[in-house]
Amino acid sequence: MNNLVRSNFQDHPFHLVSPSLWPLYTSISLLVLTSNAALAMHNFANGHYSVYLGLILVISSMSFWFRDVITEGSFLGDHTLAVQKGLNLGVILFIVSEALFFMAIFWAFFHSALTPTVELGGQWPPIGIEPINPFELPLLNTVILLSSGATVTYAHHSIIGRNREGALYGSVATVLLAIVFTGFQGVEYSVSSFTISDGAFGTCFYFGTGFHGLHVIIGTIFLLVALWRIFAYHLTDNHHLGFEAGILYWHFVDVVWLFLYISIYYWGS
């Protein structure tokens, strides 16, 4: 329903969402993914293949849901100014909730680090733990992630300035840097001398950096969708709400990584 037709039926600017299967489909997909991941971690038979099934379901549900939202905003005219304000507020509240989640992780880390118990050997890092050198791969990853923040900002300013080519180049550079960051994070995990089961240090380290890595992957998906929409001429200098939400989320990921690097990698080692 376009704006002209809508004006004949409703006297408010808000988007009344049609019934959709995707929230239920996404919930079931996430349940399948998390349940199968737990089974795989406990070495159940074919558990890893079940995780792949869960990933396929989650990716498909996200794709279908993104398709509908893009159609509503770009072609049906459902994203009025009032709707955009509501979506912006929703993104901000979502990021605040994510910040509180990471605050709990930092709380757990500093609780153990500032008052190490007898079980930890009365010191931090605990006896037997060889922490990762913060000036090697973690420092390189910090430079890579901060560089991605600069490139995504360049892409944002480019699209505002109607420089489509600059927006494309900036977005491509950001996605590539994000993929490199994720790959290096995997390399770091593979060469680490401790695991998530190695006491409070291992748990806090992998819980914090692992969930941050998950957020990097989610942010990369958001930016990939925005990149495709720039390529498909969906976004303009005054209509790029999804891109702005992805950029705001990406800057949040940058800030969280700085706190992780300073607290866990540098101070915690």
Curated annotation (Swiss-Prot):
Swiss-Prot/TrEMBL catalytic activity: 4 Fe(II)-[cytochrome c] + O2 + 8 H(+)(in) = 4 Fe(III)-[cytochrome c] + 2 H2O + 4 H(+)(out)
GO annotation terms (biological process): mitochondrial electron transport, cytochrome c to oxygen
InterPro entries, A to Z: Cyt_c/ubiquinol_Oxase_su3 (IPR024791), Cyt_c_oxase_su3_dom (IPR033945), Cyt_c_oxidase-like_su3 (IPR000298), Cyt_c_oxidase_su3-like_sf (IPR035973), Cyt_c_oxidase_su3_a-hlx (IPR013833)
Protein's membrane topology: Multi-pass membrane protein
GO cellular component: mitochondrial inner membrane
Pfam families for this protein: COX3 (PF00510)
CDD domains: Cyt_c_Oxidase_III (cd01665)
Keywords: Membrane, Mitochondrion, Mitochondrion inner membrane, Translocase, Transmembrane, Transmembrane helix
Keyword Translocase among record annotations: yes
Top EC category: translocase
SUPFAM superfamilies: Cytochrome c oxidase subunit III-like
Domain of life, per lineage: Eukaryota
Segments crossing the lipid bilayer: 13-33, 46-66, 90-110, 138-160, 167-187, 207-227, 245-265
UniProt record similarity statement: Belongs to the cytochrome c oxidase subunit 3 family.
UniProt protein name: Cytochrome c oxidase subunit 3
